[in-house]
Amino acid sequence: MQKSLITTPIYYVNDIPHIGHAYTTLIADTLKKYYTLQGEEVFFLTGTDEHGQKIEQSARLRNQSPKAYADSISTIFKDQWDFFNLDYDGFIRTTDSEHQKCVQNAFEIMFEKGDIYKGAYSGYYCVSCESYCAISKADNTNDKVLCPDCLRETTLLEEESYFFRLSAYEKPLLDFYAKNPEAILPVYRKNEVTSFIEQGLLDLSITRTSFEWGIPLPKKMNDPKHVVYVWLDALLNYASALGYLNDLDNKMAHFECARHIVGKDILRFHAIYWPAFLMSLNLPLFKQLCVHGWWTIEGVKMSKSLGNVLDAQKIAMEYGIEELRYFLLREVPFGQDGDFSKKALIERINANLNNDLGNLLNRLLGMAKKYFNHSLKSTKITAYYSKELEKVHQILDNANSFVPKMQLHKALEELFNVYDFLNKLIAKEEPWVLHKNNESEKLEALLSLIANALLQSSFLLYAFMPKSAVKLANAFNTEITPDNYERFFKAKKLQDMILQDTEPLFSKMEKIEKTEKAGEASPEKNEKEKKDAKEKAPLKQENYIGIEDFKKVEIKVGLIKEAQRIEKSNKLLRLKVDLGEGRLRQIISGIALDYEPESLVGQMVCVVANLKPAKLMGEMSEGMILAVRDSDNLALISPTREKIAGSLIS
């Protein structure tokens, strides 16, 4: 079995996690699930970076020790990944004793090899970036030298330092990237890296004496004033977490196929420093370095000073974990910057998740129950729908091909093209007409095609939306496993099925007409204030009705037995409803824009049973179905538990 490693960067504990951290970690979790289904033994590693001058300063401001401060923030990161149900195998902290031993041992190896030497460093140091700036690159403004990367003021420092001979690895690095053109994705990021290397590499300062919070040098170096600088310390986590130099469980076997997920701001460190360190230690180089962009908020870069830093956990609690996963992975081409807005999130939920996929499953389950008592045979699919089946398989294979290329948005786009195709096929074939015309064999072939396509799609959907995919597969009495992936997704085996009802995959969300800006009250808050004010306002006398009037209204539980469209009307449906009276009542209801007729059969509803009969479009209506409508959609009111048709509601 192929062993592999998928990593996030270890997150710096100078602040709590935000949506950028969540995005990186969700990508890693997606790849873990994708490659696990393909049969790989994947080790998914994340963690926290806890050393450095910024941590020392942040702890001092809070009257804490650096370790106590790091403990508190690291716990927040770990708790957030647990909230998101992320399937990580290791959570490393650079304050772990085993990591410290690994870094010290690696330092000794590199020193004895001659790749580390002692010297002195003079330059403008940026505390925020934890690095020195070349004087020629720094921006000299009003006698202040600003960091060219973050534009914060730097400090002129001169200190003794140990250096790594990065300059010796220019050619090996260029040779590696020439032989492995897709080692960095997107590929244009690799071109940036090779261009930087070709300009010439300077040796790298890897220790500091200006602060104490870091890993001390090995005792045999006899140089206690030095601590290992953040990048040698931090990058070695990918090896120390697997037991490098102390590998009792043979975890380092995963290291030979490593995929690192990083943001574009730390590309240089991972694409130049890290492979050079690996070459020095005679360790295998990574298989892929996958580099994503940044998220802005309503077009503005996230900033604590602007108050627009987004907490991914709060968003997920409001809109759903699966829904947020889908949005982040679908909305933006991997590698590019993306803009987050609640309005766009809601549009994705309603259009793609609720309408395209959720309603498709609901319609299928309703028709399978109505026409075939949940049981579908696949034997006639190829006789009636061979071209359609081939089309579905072509789209699924195409979607699958995008994941190893890190084109995750395209994979999801193609996957949802399957659902769009199936919805259009229902509209074209009109299964209710097939049933009316007694074309039972063709109808069963159509529904079985849709069922098999949905089942097969669930195995790719699983990487992106695991809980939704499991629910989808469960509707077809199938589990998401590597064996079933081989059987249904790769081999495209068609299956006779007994379908089972499942709760809706998604819920429709209310649209936000005006997006929330930093410093403004949210739409949710405004709505709550309006609601509170409305509740506090006294009712006008003419709005009251007496209890005797209310008692006249007879509301009963009804079971919809039949549902049909009414010719020449796009709003009305003809429903036959069982109210426990020994006959079916005909009720004309204006819900055709929100419900397909076949999806209503078998649904429990609330009916005003003693309404005076009236004619609508020439059809007699003997009651009213109760529903609730907002500005965008309508929903039927149903009992939360199954009741006997005709039960009186009081």
Swiss-Prot record:
HAMAP family in alphabetical order: Met_tRNA_synth_type2
Protein's UniProt name: Methionine--tRNA ligase
Main location: cytoplasm
GO molecular function: ATP binding; metal ion binding; methionine-tRNA ligase activity; tRNA binding
Binding site for Zn(2+): 126, 129, 147, 150
Organism annotation: Helicobacter pylori (strain ATCC 700392 / 26695)
Record text on subunit structure and interactions: Homodimer.
A GO biological process held by the record: methionyl-tRNA aminoacylation
Extent of motif 'HIGH' region: 11-21
Sequence positions that bind ATP: 304
EC number(s) per entry: 6.1.1.10
Ligase as UniProt keyword: yes
Binding note for cofactor: Binds 1 zinc ion per subunit.
Cellular localisation: Cytoplasm
Location of the region described as Disordered in the Swiss-Prot/TrEMBL record: 513-535
Every tRNA-binding domain range: 549-650
SUPFAM superfamilies: Anticodon-binding domain of a subclass of class I aminoacyl-tRNA synthetases (SSF47323), Nucleic acid-binding proteins (SSF50249), Nucleotidylyl transferase (SSF52374)
Purpose: Is required not only for elongation of protein synthesis but also for the initiation of all mRNA translation through initiator tRNA(fMet) aminoacylation.
